[in-house]
Structure formats: C-alpha cells, structure tokens
C-alpha cells in the first residue's frame, strides 16, 4: 500500500510539472499573438474602408476609362496612377512617372483575379474584380520596371506584362 501511495505522489508531481509547463506555453503563445496584432496590423485597411467599382462598367466610366488620363498629379511630387489589370495586360502601358515622386497606384480588374508585382520593388498586390487595390511607392532610381501578373488568370497569363518607366 505504501508503494502505491509513493507511486501516486510521483505521478502527481510529474503531472503538475507538465501542467505548469503547458500553462506557461499557453501564456507565451497568447503574449506572442497579442504582440503580433499590436505591431503588425498597422496600415491594414479594414473591410469597410475598401474602395469598390462596378467591374462591368469600369472600362467605360471613371478614372480607369481613359488611359491617357491615368496618371494624375495630385500634389507637388505626388501622383495617382489608375491601373486596369485585364486578361492579358495592363492599362496604361507603359506607365511614366518621375523619379522620387510618391506614387499611389489604384488598381482594379474588370474580369478575373490578377496580380500586380513590380520587379525590383516590394510592390505585390492581388487585384480583385470590383475592388480597388491601393499601394504607395517612391521610385528612387530611374529606369524601366517590369510589371508581372503573379496570379494565374487564364491561358495567356504567361504573357501578361507591363512596364513602368521612371524618368529623371
């Protein structure tokens, strides 16, 4: 009987150790999640603030209708570029912007999901029909930057390219 009591106490101590370890890990995970939410969600646009357009009429009306008017100067050294991603290209193409200017890209699609990735930069946006994807960037070096679609959008996907020309 005494041996059983000692064995039970040993198992109980072992279980308490694992319980304490599990609770400590739970608190660590909760702290990490709280830290991530507090520090990595800045700048995320809540769903209610999304800009939407009618994908069936986006080519006929609004700022995406006329490629000649797609690059708009909104302030000193600030531009907004309205980009239409469609199967299988980008409009306007090429996009010409000045070096050092703050560029706000507003990208949408009239047909299917596309990607808008500018090589050599951290611009990488998923473009959904009916929604306007917005991204800001300042090109510090002049040159040509290639836009590629990195979201499969159909049989001509591999040929979907565009160009951004950054002028001095």
Curated annotation (Swiss-Prot):
It is a single-pass membrane protein. One of its GO terms (cellular component) is plasma membrane. Residues 39-168 are periplasmic. GO terms for molecular function: copper ion binding; cytochrome-c oxidase activity. Its main location: membrane. It is found in: Cell membrane. Belongs to the cytochrome c oxidase subunit 2 family. This is Cytochrome c oxidase subunit 2. It comes from Thermus thermophilus (strain ATCC 27634 / DSM 579 / HB8).
């Amino acid at each position: 009987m005494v041996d059983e009591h000692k064995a039970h106490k040993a198992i109980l101590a072992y279980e308490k150790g694992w319980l304490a370890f599990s609770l400590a890990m739970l608190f660590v995970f909760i702290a990490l999640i709280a830290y991530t939410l507090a520090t990595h969600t800045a700048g995320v646009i809540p769903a209610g603030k999304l800009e939407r357009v009618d994908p069936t009429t986006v080519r006929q009306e609004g700022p995406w209708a006329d490629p000649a008017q797609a690059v708009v100067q909104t302030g000193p050294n600030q531009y907004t570029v309205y980009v239409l991603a469609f199967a299988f290209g980008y409009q306007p193409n090429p996009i010409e912007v000045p070096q050092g200017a703050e560029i706000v890209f507003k990208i949408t699609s009239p047909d299917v999901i596309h990607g808008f990735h500018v090589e050599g930069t951290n611009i990488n946006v998923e473009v959904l029909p009916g929604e306007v994807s917005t991204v800001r960037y300042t090109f510090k070096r002049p040159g040509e930057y290639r836009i590629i679609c990195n979201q499969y959008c159909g049989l001509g996907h591999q040929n979907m390219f565009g160009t951004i020309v950054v002028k001095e």
